[in-house]
Amino acid sequence: MIQSTLDREGRFYRGTLHIHTTVSDGELTPEATKALYKSNGYDFIAITDHNVYGVYDDLNDDDFLMIPGTEIDSVYQGGVHHVVGVGTPEGTGYAHGFRFDRTRLKNAHPQELVDELTAHGNMAIYAHPFWSYCDPALLFSLRGLTGMEIINYSCEQEWKSGVSEFYYEYLRARGSGLWCFGADDAHGHEPDNMGGDITVKAPELKHEALLGAIKRGSFYASFARAGEKAPEIYDFRVEDGVAIVECSPARNIHINVSRTCYHPAHAAQGQQLTRHTFRLPEDARQVRAIVSDFQGLVSWTQPIVLK
């Protein structure tokens, strides 16, 4: 039996679901943002300006997709909470340019932010928990999230607080079913474009197909740098009790079951890895993999929940 979150058929599409433009506090227009990412090999983006919903149907091409979205926020009991919402052009309940009620939401519990987005057909993704100094227990308590950002490139570039792997492992160890996302959160104030992204395996580059693949975990998250690509993960599966990773040339591949059950592989001097396997213990409940290259760029699979 084979288990995997990655679809068995389809092709890979690269994109990012968290970008700001001149519509809020970014420095590039939506048109210039689309042109930048498309010229650098991306297949899709979501423009998620603060507290305003963007659809941008007029910027869609046959080979480039604009995902509707927004980022809404609140200050609750002294904590700052940001939640990204993304959806399909027809299925979100928000028109292009819709502005959220800041009076109602500015001090809302973060659960209200999630509920606002999901009630209108959006996926909700908790943004940059490390930058927000979010209480991990509060994050774990939220219901209706699709995932959280394991890497936020802008936060990493400006504050060195963009890698939230501790939060993700905290949630995973407690049985959370959230997926992990890479995101740019680009504003243009620093070199904060094209460093956090996701690569989705989907049947085609259409809104429903792409977002459906994301919902079922058919993607991996990456931390790269502008002009460079993180390790590519071609497949991650469990076959007859063995976890198998296949990837582009890498320095390290970690297969992690739990804090006390893991299996790393490290390339010897002058060599590289493109595959790693680990026979899982019979009581393993889930497994994920992390792949890093010789420049320190990283990709994270989604966890496979074992049956």
Specify the residue positions occupied by each region the protein language model found:
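A metal-dependent hydrolase metal-coordination microenvironment
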Residues: I2-A127, C134-P136, S141-R143, E149-Y167, ...
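Ligand-binding clefts/hinges and TM-proximal coupling segments of bilobed small-molecule sensing domains
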Residues: E112-L113, H120, P129, E228-E232, ...
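Hydrophobic, Leu/Ile/Phe/Ala-enriched alpha-helical segments that form helix-helix packing faces
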Residues: L117, L171-R172, I214
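Short, hydrophobic/aliphatic alpha-helical segments
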Residues: S164-G177
